[in-house]
A protein has these predicted regions:
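Flexible helix-coil linker/hinge segments at domain or subdomain boundaries
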Residues: 150, 248-252, 374-381, 633, ...
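Active-site His/Glu-centered metal-binding helix of metallohydrolases
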Residues: 74-82, 310, 568
Length: 932
């Protein structure tokens, strides 16, 4: 909410609303905010989504920007050390205790460091026992002021940080780091990048880390946030007691706030990288921030809303431009927000098409000048006002079912950024008052003030390739000046179509009703053969999720047609529906909170969607059109091909592409049905074949099962009428399909593909995969496979990350699939120092064989069972989970609601050992390793 005073009109509007004086915004009465004498701030809120769970966060208003040169990277290093020994939790004690009650490291126990903040969290902590709550608060206390920073733990973590640096050392990060000194000369923001310097990481003295900790970690820079199913009064007293003896941070200096200098003339910054895959053109118009005392006032709120509307109108223009084949970019957007702690910016970005970099820059200049010169039309403004009001209305309707973690994030942003937290009721009422007062002339004046020559930074990040031509610094400035004298067509008013379907189809009937008691779901069979399943919930007051599936997918598509099939749903979504282009359709949906999207996968076709209660019929109409009226649009197809050609032009510059392609070829044993989307495959695609495939896959709605989950009542007559009309009115036939066995299998036997690639950062990328086709698809087998992946993840965390410091992390997962035939699969993937590759690969297999020979450790098995059961309990309060439960029930005949808990409880060390042994003894294992 840190905005500058844009115009006297906006200021006058703000003041008129506030009796000639900017008024502070209220804080939601459900949030208790307090501050202790030592400077510690706290936020406490009772919230029951999910029930019997709570969020415990500590926000530190310090980050990498505060490091000295010899501490470069140590703010982030310190964050890691918070999990390696504290006053009350020795060693890995925090992780060990909370994982024993189902709170997982990584997912629920985590932290992040940025330039200006460091935030730690314990998420979805059970509140069923007071001892757990006390332990969580004790962790907050230790993270605030009780880190041990033992020398052996510091040394052990150096390797982990090195590997995190290696994992992130890719083209985009290198260019970001290289361009900041050019954009922000002399600023602290030009010097710091969070991950830091490996020379510092490898060699810093222990006291360098301790000095940063002692200087900046203190109660005046910290806020404790507790949100969930807790007693607010009790938590407040516990916080006061725990922090009673924590001293204020005295004689260590105020936390400085750094900025970036103003510039009278444009700054032009250009960097290139050998592995970059696209050109990013960015224009930053720096603006002074609103003074701190005004940031949480009604004046700031009005200005923020006005700026959001302006950016949204500009983005709508860019979106419409992107639908044209002659568009010079593959992606574009703008936003207004905090650039650094003491400066805001309006930022506009183009991702240029290959070979059109100069044209893209000129077009960006033209669009900005068009906004500056003419502003926007009344119809453009009315569109974004409708969207804005619909968003606030949905938030208001769902104010009673906001999840704990989202409420915690609101408090964190209030503390760190002065973001307001007045509550959805206040905001919805206020926005309804403000929007009518924001006229097009006022917003056009704001738009004009956004685009200026002073305080402008123009930057280009591009591939190091002779075919990528960029303007020089001088040419970039010349083009900026020239655009002001060019003729630019003014925008024109447009009428917005509102009806998606002019004539509704003849409604069908509900011929059969079946209630599935175990799922609390109602199943209808309609007169046209369509099957509908309705699951009412109360988890979200204004959310309805929609999903439909049918068997078939790519497995029923001829091999020669797969390139076109891969584009089929993109072609339809970009082509529009019925007589509406995609742009017309987008405008017709203005102000509606609805989405529908078709998809085709290897063995299924599906439609997914969501809507508010009042937009449910619109969602059904969109689904109706996706089945009945996909639109052939040559122009949109050429737009798609142009975008894809540009995206693929530099695809192979990234060595990770060679690695992922190699993995995919192993997964399919070099089948000619392998879809690796490259230029050669794109050249084989055609518009007509793509539409033919789409129409074939969605030819018979009676072959689909349609699901509705959310705030929907199957007994509601209006809902029944909508379903009978838009689903029951679909034309169907008697043809029912099953997915075919496309004969695609993983490479059999023991296979190894080791190869080298040129790369900027020397990295060994590794993929290991075990597959068995000898295991039937059952819930027990699937959960034993999942358990194997979970337990091995823990083993690799301890052996490869913590003991060896060899990798930032090993991605590990295991599961079962039904198609094309039942099979079980275990994958492990990681990056490491090439010098350590062989040793770590051996550890990967050793951990597997240890379980095969001895079974899993009891502590690993028990904590993962606890975690799975805890996750299950939490998932039962999510609409998305129920949608998944229903689809699995109808696809695979497995009832998670009745069977999952018992199946998890029945997992034993013996069942895990036997399952993994069977997987390994199948004898199908491949390794893909890419070396520099």
């Amino acid at each position: 909410m840190k905005k500058f005073i844009l115009s006297t009109l906006v200021l006058a509007l703000s003041l008129s609303m506030a009796a000639q004086q900017p008024q502070p915004l209220p804080i939601d009465s459900a949030v208790r905010v307090g501050k202790l004498d030592n400077g510690l701030t706290y936020y406490i809120r009772h919230n029951e989504y999910p029930k019997q769970r709570a969020e415990f966060h500590i926000a530190q208003a310090v980050g990498a920007i505060l490091e000295e040169d010899h501490q470069n990277g140590l703010a982030h290093f310190l964050e890691h050390m918070a999990f390696n020994g504290t006053e009350h939790f020795a060693g890995k004690g925090i992780i060990e205790y909370f994982e024993s009650i189902g709170v997982n490291f990584g997912g629920n126990i985590n932290a992040y460091t940025s330039l200006d903040e460091t935030v730690y969290r314990l998420s979805e902590v059970p509140t069923v026992r007071e001892g757990i709550i006390d332990s969580a608060l004790l962790v907050m206390h230790d993270w605030a002021c009780g880190l041990l920073l033992l020398e052996d733990e510091i040394d052990a973590e150096r390797g982990v940080i090195r590997e995190e640096w290696r994992t992130g050392a890719q083209a985009n990060r290198r260019m970001w780091k290289a361009i900041n000194p050019l954009k922000y000369p002399g600023s602290q923001y030009a010097k710091r990048d969070v991950i830091g310097d490996t020379a510092v990481i490898n060699n810093f003295t222990y006291d360098a880390l301790r000095d940063y900790y002692k200087k900046w970690y203190g109660p005046d820079n910290q806020a404790i946030i507790v949100v969930g199913d807790i007693d607010v009064d009790q938590i407040e007293q516990k916080i006061k007691a725990l922090w009673a003896d924590v001293p204020a941070r005295a004689n260590r200096g105020e936390r400085p706030l750094y900025s970036v200098d103003d510039n009278a003339e444009p700054i032009v910054a250009i960097v290139r990288d050998k592995e970059a895959q696209y050109t990013r053109i960015e224009m930053e118009f720096k603006k002074p921030q609103l003074p701190k005392q005004f940031r949480c006032t009604d004046m700031a709120y009005v200005q923020s809303l006005a700026l959001d509307l302006v950016c949204e109108m500009f983005n709508n223009r860019l979106s419409e431009l992107s639908m044209k084949p002659e568009a010079t970019f593959v992606g574009a957007g703008s936003y207004y927000g905090e650039l650094v702690k003491e400066k805001d910016a309006f930022v506009a970005i183009y991702l240029a098409k290959q070979g059109q970099e100069v044209a893209a820059y000129k077009d960006l200049l033209t669009q900005l000048e068009k906004m500056r010169r003419y502003g926007f039309t009344t119809s453009e403004l009315e569109r974004v006002k409708k969207e804005c009001l619909a968003a606030y209305e949905k938030a208001y309707n769902e104010r009673g079912t906001v999840r704990n973690i989202n409420r915690a994030q609101e408090c964190i942003r209030h503390y760190l950024d002065d973001s307001p937290i007045p509550g959805e009721e206040w905001e919805y009422q206020m926005v309804q008052q403000i929007l009518p007062m924001l006229g097009v002339d006022m917003l056009n004046q704001i738009a004009q003030n956004l685009v200026t020559d002073e305080n402008l930074i123009i930057s280009f990040q591009a591939p190091e390739d002779k075919s990528v031509v960029l303007p020089t610094e001088a040419e970039a400035v010349e083009m900026l000046a020239a655009v002001k004298n060019e003729e630019i067509e003014a925008p024109v008013e447009e009428a917005i179509r509102e009806n998606l379907v002019e004539t509704a189809p003849k409604a069908g009937k509900i011929k059969k009703t079946n209630y599935i008691e175990s799922l609390g779901a109602t199943e209808w069979t309609l007169s046209n053969g369509v099957r509908v399943v309705v699951k009412p919930t109360t988890f979200k007051q204004d959310e309805i999720l929609f999903y439909a599936f049918s068997q078939g997918g790519y497995s029923l598509v001829a091999t020669a047609d797969l390139p076109s099939a891969a584009l089929a749903t993109d072609v339809v979504e970009l082509g529009g529906l019925a007589d509406m282009s995609a742009t017309d359709l987008q405008k017709a949906l203005t102000g509606k909170r609805v989405s529908v999207s078709p998809s085709i996968s290897a063995y299924n076709e599906s439609v997914s969607g969501s809507s508010t209660i009042k937009d449910l019929e619109t969602m059904l109409q969109l689904n109706y059109l996706y089945f009945t009226a996909p639109r052939r649009d040559e122009e949109s197809y050429q737009t798609l091909i142009s975008i894809l050609n540009s995206q693929l032009a530099n695809r192979d510059k990234n060595p990770k592409v060679a690695f992922s392609d190699s993995v995919q070829m192993m997964q399919t044993d070099h089948s000619d049905r392998t879809i690796i989307f490259n230029k050669a495959m794109l050249d084989k695609a055609s518009l007509d074949k793509a539409l033919e495939v789409y129409k074939a896959r969605f030819a018979n709605p009676a072959d689909f099962t349609f699901f509705f989950v959310g705030n929907v009542d199957p007994n509601d007559e209006v809902f029944q009428t909508q379903v009978r009309t838009w689903l029951g009115g679909l034309k169907t036939n008697k043809k029912l399909e099953k997915a075919a066995d496309d004969k695609v299998r993983v490479a059999m036997g023991i296979q190894k593909n080791y190869f080298t690639r040129q790369m900027e950062t020397k990295t060994a990328s590794n993929r290991i995969q075990y597959t068995s086709y000898d295991m039937p698809y059952t819930l027990a087998n699937d959960l034993n496979m999942e358990m194997i992946g979970r337990i091995l993840s823990t083993r690799y965390l301890e052996s490869i990350r913590e003991r060896e410091g060899g990798s930032y992390g090993v991605g590990c997962a295991a599961w079962m699939n039904r198609h094309p035939v039942p099979y079980a699969q275990l994958i492990m993937q990681f990056d490491t120092d090439p010098e350590k590759q062989e040793k770590l690969m051996n550890i990967i297999h050793e951990e597997v064989m240890t379980i095969v020979e001895n079974g899993p450790l009891a502590k690993d098995l028990n904590k993962e069972k606890e975690s799975m059961l805890k996750d299950f309990q939490e998932d039962l309060e999510k609409n998305s989970y129920w949608k998944s439960v229903l689809s699995i029930y109808y696809k695979n005949g497995i009832n998670y609601i009745t069977d999952y808990k018992a199946a998890v409880e029945n997992i034993t060390a013996e069942s895990v050992q036997a399952t993994l042994k069977k997987l390994v003894e199948a004898g199908n294992m491949f390794e893909v390793v890419m070396l520099p």
